[in-house]
Amino acid sequence: MFIISRKLRKEDKYLSDLGENQYRDLFIGIDTQVPLVNGKMIVPIGFDNGATTPSFKSSYRAFCRGLLTYGAVARGTGQKSETTTQLYENARQIILNFFNVGKDDNYTAIFAKHTTECMNILANVLIKDKNERVLTTRMEHHANDLPWRHTCMVDYVEVDENGRLKIDELESKLKKSNGKIKYVSITGASNVTGYVNPIHEIATICHRYNAKIIVDAAQLVAHKKINMRGSKPCERIDFLVFSPYLNLFE
Protein backbone atom coordinates (compact mmCIF):
# COMPACT_ATOMS: atom_id res chain seq x y z
CA MET A 1 0.00 0.00 0.00
CA PHE A 2 1.11 3.55 -0.55
CA ILE A 3 0.65 6.60 1.68
CA ILE A 4 1.50 9.74 -0.23
CA SER A 5 2.04 13.06 1.57
CA ARG A 6 3.07 16.42 0.26
CA LYS A 7 3.18 20.06 1.35
CA LEU A 8 0.74 22.50 -0.21
CA ARG A 9 2.28 24.59 -2.95
CA LYS A 10 1.52 28.29 -3.31
CA GLU A 11 -0.71 27.63 -6.32
CA ASP A 12 -2.76 24.98 -4.48
CA LYS A 13 -6.20 25.75 -3.13
CA TYR A 14 -7.81 24.32 -0.03
CA LEU A 15 -10.55 21.80 -0.83
CA SER A 16 -13.18 24.02 0.79
CA ASP A 17 -12.39 26.75 -1.76
CA LEU A 18 -12.93 24.55 -4.82
CA GLY A 19 -15.96 24.52 -7.09
CA GLU A 20 -17.64 21.36 -8.40
CA ASN A 21 -15.61 21.15 -11.61
CA GLN A 22 -12.39 21.90 -9.73
CA TYR A 23 -13.02 18.93 -7.44
CA ARG A 24 -13.19 16.67 -10.49
CA ASP A 25 -9.89 18.03 -11.72
CA LEU A 26 -8.15 16.72 -8.61
CA PHE A 27 -8.66 13.08 -9.56
CA ILE A 28 -7.19 10.81 -12.19
CA GLY A 29 -9.39 8.62 -14.40
CA ILE A 30 -12.64 10.48 -13.71
CA ASP A 31 -13.29 11.05 -17.43
CA THR A 32 -12.13 7.63 -18.64
CA GLN A 33 -14.80 6.13 -20.90
CA VAL A 34 -16.10 2.56 -20.64
CA PRO A 35 -18.12 0.53 -23.19
CA LEU A 36 -21.80 -0.37 -22.86
CA VAL A 37 -23.28 -3.65 -24.12
CA ASN A 38 -24.36 -1.90 -27.34
CA GLY A 39 -20.81 -0.72 -27.97
CA LYS A 40 -21.43 2.90 -27.04
CA MET A 41 -18.71 4.58 -24.97
CA ILE A 42 -19.72 6.65 -21.93
CA VAL A 43 -18.13 8.31 -18.91
CA PRO A 44 -19.46 6.35 -15.90
CA ILE A 45 -20.61 7.77 -12.58
CA GLY A 46 -18.89 5.90 -9.77
CA PHE A 47 -20.81 4.80 -6.67
CA ASP A 48 -18.27 2.30 -5.33
CA ASN A 49 -16.14 4.57 -3.15
CA GLY A 50 -16.89 2.24 -0.24
CA ALA A 51 -14.84 -0.38 -2.10
CA THR A 52 -12.10 1.77 -3.67
CA THR A 53 -11.82 5.53 -4.06
CA PRO A 54 -10.33 7.30 -7.10
CA SER A 55 -6.74 8.51 -6.78
CA PHE A 56 -5.52 12.08 -6.67
CA LYS A 57 -3.45 13.29 -9.61
CA SER A 58 -0.91 14.52 -7.08
CA SER A 59 -0.67 10.99 -5.66
CA TYR A 60 -0.06 9.64 -9.15
CA ARG A 61 2.71 12.19 -9.72
CA ALA A 62 4.33 11.31 -6.39
CA PHE A 63 4.08 7.61 -7.22
CA CYS A 64 5.82 8.18 -10.54
CA ARG A 65 8.58 10.17 -8.83
CA GLY A 66 9.05 7.34 -6.37
CA LEU A 67 9.54 4.84 -9.18
CA LEU A 68 12.60 6.77 -10.35
CA THR A 69 14.46 5.80 -7.17
CA TYR A 70 12.56 2.60 -6.36
CA GLY A 71 14.60 -0.13 -4.66
CA ALA A 72 14.30 -2.94 -2.11
CA VAL A 73 13.18 -1.83 1.36
CA ALA A 74 15.84 -2.55 4.00
CA ARG A 75 17.64 -4.94 1.65
CA GLY A 76 20.73 -3.05 0.54
CA THR A 77 23.04 -0.08 0.94
CA GLY A 78 22.64 1.31 -2.56
CA GLN A 79 21.16 4.76 -3.01
CA LYS A 80 17.84 3.51 -4.42
CA SER A 81 17.38 0.99 -1.63
CA GLU A 82 18.20 3.55 1.05
CA THR A 83 15.91 6.16 -0.53
CA THR A 84 13.00 3.71 -0.74
CA THR A 85 13.60 2.51 2.82
CA GLN A 86 13.52 6.11 4.06
CA LEU A 87 10.25 6.76 2.21
CA TYR A 88 8.80 3.59 3.72
CA GLU A 89 9.74 4.58 7.27
CA ASN A 90 8.59 8.16 6.71
CA ALA A 91 5.18 6.79 5.69
CA ARG A 92 4.97 4.91 8.97
CA GLN A 93 5.62 8.12 10.92
CA ILE A 94 3.11 10.06 8.79
CA ILE A 95 0.43 7.53 9.69
CA LEU A 96 1.21 7.72 13.41
CA ASN A 97 1.15 11.52 13.33
CA PHE A 98 -2.15 11.49 11.45
CA PHE A 99 -3.78 9.64 14.35
CA ASN A 100 -2.03 11.76 17.02
CA VAL A 101 0.23 8.99 18.31
CA GLY A 102 3.43 10.00 16.52
CA LYS A 103 5.25 10.74 19.78
CA ASP A 104 3.84 7.79 21.74
CA ASP A 105 6.24 4.83 21.92
CA ASN A 106 3.33 2.53 22.80
CA TYR A 107 2.11 2.68 19.19
CA THR A 108 3.51 1.56 15.87
CA ALA A 109 2.19 1.29 12.30
CA ILE A 110 2.18 -2.14 10.65
CA PHE A 111 1.75 -2.45 6.89
CA ALA A 112 -0.45 -5.13 5.32
CA LYS A 113 -2.30 -5.58 2.02
CA HIS A 114 -5.78 -4.59 3.22
CA THR A 115 -8.14 -4.50 6.20
CA THR A 116 -9.01 -8.19 5.93
CA GLU A 117 -5.36 -9.21 6.18
CA CYS A 118 -4.86 -6.82 9.12
CA MET A 119 -7.74 -8.43 10.99
CA ASN A 120 -6.42 -11.91 10.27
CA ILE A 121 -2.99 -10.89 11.57
CA LEU A 122 -4.50 -9.55 14.80
CA ALA A 123 -6.72 -12.60 15.26
CA ASN A 124 -3.77 -14.96 14.87
CA VAL A 125 -1.29 -12.95 16.94
CA LEU A 126 -3.50 -11.84 19.84
CA ILE A 127 -5.47 -15.04 20.38
CA LYS A 128 -3.54 -17.81 22.13
CA ASP A 129 -6.35 -20.27 22.89
CA LYS A 130 -9.48 -21.37 21.02
CA ASN A 131 -11.46 -20.91 24.23
CA GLU A 132 -10.65 -17.20 24.48
CA ARG A 133 -13.60 -14.89 23.91
CA VAL A 134 -13.81 -11.84 21.66
CA LEU A 135 -16.76 -9.47 21.65
CA THR A 136 -17.87 -7.96 18.34
CA THR A 137 -21.18 -6.72 16.90
CA ARG A 138 -23.93 -7.54 14.41
CA MET A 139 -23.00 -4.57 12.21
CA GLU A 140 -19.55 -5.83 11.21
CA HIS A 141 -18.06 -6.40 7.78
CA HIS A 142 -16.98 -10.02 7.30
CA ALA A 143 -13.38 -8.85 7.60
CA ASN A 144 -14.07 -8.13 11.28
CA ASP A 145 -16.06 -11.29 11.91
CA LEU A 146 -14.68 -14.36 10.14
CA PRO A 147 -11.08 -14.06 11.44
CA TRP A 148 -12.34 -14.23 15.03
CA ARG A 149 -14.63 -17.18 14.31
CA HIS A 150 -11.63 -19.17 13.11
CA THR A 151 -9.46 -18.43 16.13
CA CYS A 152 -11.66 -18.16 19.21
CA MET A 153 -15.14 -17.98 20.76
CA VAL A 154 -17.13 -14.98 19.50
CA ASP A 155 -19.99 -13.15 21.18
CA TYR A 156 -22.07 -10.45 19.49
CA VAL A 157 -23.63 -7.17 20.60
CA GLU A 158 -26.96 -6.54 18.88
CA VAL A 159 -28.16 -3.37 17.15
CA ASP A 160 -31.48 -1.65 17.76
CA GLU A 161 -34.34 -1.06 15.29
CA ASN A 162 -32.51 2.04 13.99
CA GLY A 163 -29.27 0.17 13.29
CA ARG A 164 -27.44 1.67 16.26
CA LEU A 165 -25.23 -0.37 18.55
CA LYS A 166 -26.73 -1.29 21.93
CA ILE A 167 -24.05 0.24 24.14
CA ASP A 168 -25.75 -0.93 27.35
CA GLU A 169 -25.67 -4.51 26.10
CA LEU A 170 -21.98 -4.21 25.29
CA GLU A 171 -21.20 -3.10 28.83
CA SER A 172 -23.44 -5.79 30.29
CA LYS A 173 -21.63 -8.55 28.38
CA LEU A 174 -18.25 -7.23 29.49
CA LYS A 175 -19.36 -7.04 33.10
CA LYS A 176 -20.78 -10.58 33.09
CA SER A 177 -17.63 -12.00 31.51
CA ASN A 178 -15.63 -11.26 34.68
CA GLY A 179 -12.56 -10.33 32.67
CA LYS A 180 -12.72 -13.30 30.28
CA ILE A 181 -13.32 -11.01 27.28
CA LYS A 182 -9.92 -9.51 26.49
CA TYR A 183 -10.73 -7.85 23.15
CA VAL A 184 -13.69 -5.93 21.74
CA SER A 185 -13.53 -5.55 17.95
CA ILE A 186 -15.96 -3.06 16.41
CA THR A 187 -16.48 -1.06 13.26
CA GLY A 188 -15.91 2.67 13.39
CA ALA A 189 -18.61 3.22 10.76
CA SER A 190 -20.97 0.68 9.24
CA ASN A 191 -20.30 -0.11 5.58
CA VAL A 192 -24.05 -0.78 5.18
CA THR A 193 -25.82 2.07 6.98
CA GLY A 194 -23.02 4.58 7.52
CA TYR A 195 -23.79 4.72 11.25
CA VAL A 196 -20.76 5.99 13.19
CA ASN A 197 -20.03 4.30 16.49
CA PRO A 198 -18.88 6.40 19.49
CA ILE A 199 -15.51 4.68 19.58
CA HIS A 200 -14.06 6.68 22.48
CA GLU A 201 -17.11 6.03 24.65
CA ILE A 202 -16.85 2.34 23.80
CA ALA A 203 -13.11 2.41 24.53
CA THR A 204 -13.82 3.79 28.00
CA ILE A 205 -16.24 0.95 28.69
CA CYS A 206 -13.77 -1.65 27.39
CA HIS A 207 -10.94 -0.38 29.57
CA ARG A 208 -13.25 -0.29 32.58
CA TYR A 209 -13.43 -4.08 32.32
CA ASN A 210 -9.77 -4.59 31.34
CA ALA A 211 -10.51 -5.29 27.67
CA LYS A 212 -8.69 -3.76 24.72
CA ILE A 213 -10.55 -2.17 21.81
CA ILE A 214 -9.90 -2.91 18.14
CA VAL A 215 -11.50 -0.48 15.67
CA ASP A 216 -12.16 -1.38 12.04
CA ALA A 217 -11.85 2.14 10.63
CA ALA A 218 -11.97 1.21 6.94
CA GLN A 219 -15.13 3.27 6.38
CA LEU A 220 -14.36 5.96 8.96
CA VAL A 221 -10.85 7.30 8.31
CA ALA A 222 -11.83 9.30 5.22
CA HIS A 223 -14.76 11.01 6.90
CA LYS A 224 -13.73 11.79 10.46
CA LYS A 225 -10.54 12.86 12.21
CA ILE A 226 -9.50 10.12 14.63
CA ASN A 227 -7.42 10.88 17.71
CA MET A 228 -6.29 7.47 18.96
CA ARG A 229 -5.23 8.96 22.29
CA GLY A 230 -8.68 10.36 23.00
CA SER A 231 -9.17 13.30 25.34
CA LYS A 232 -8.12 11.21 28.37
CA PRO A 233 -6.28 7.90 28.92
CA CYS A 234 -9.41 5.77 29.27
CA GLU A 235 -10.52 6.82 25.76
CA ARG A 236 -7.43 5.56 23.95
CA ILE A 237 -7.87 3.26 20.95
CA ASP A 238 -5.62 0.22 21.32
CA PHE A 239 -5.72 -1.02 17.71
CA LEU A 240 -6.92 0.80 14.58
CA VAL A 241 -7.20 -0.94 11.20
CA PHE A 242 -7.88 0.65 7.80
CA SER A 243 -7.06 0.44 4.09
CA PRO A 244 -5.66 3.48 2.23
CA TYR A 245 -7.29 2.44 -1.04
CA LEU A 246 -10.73 2.91 0.56
CA ASN A 247 -9.93 6.51 1.40
CA LEU A 248 -8.81 9.74 -0.21
CA PHE A 249 -5.18 10.21 0.77
CA GLU A 250 -3.06 12.96 -0.70
Residue spans of the language-model regions?
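Pyridoxal 5′-phosphate
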Residues: 1-250
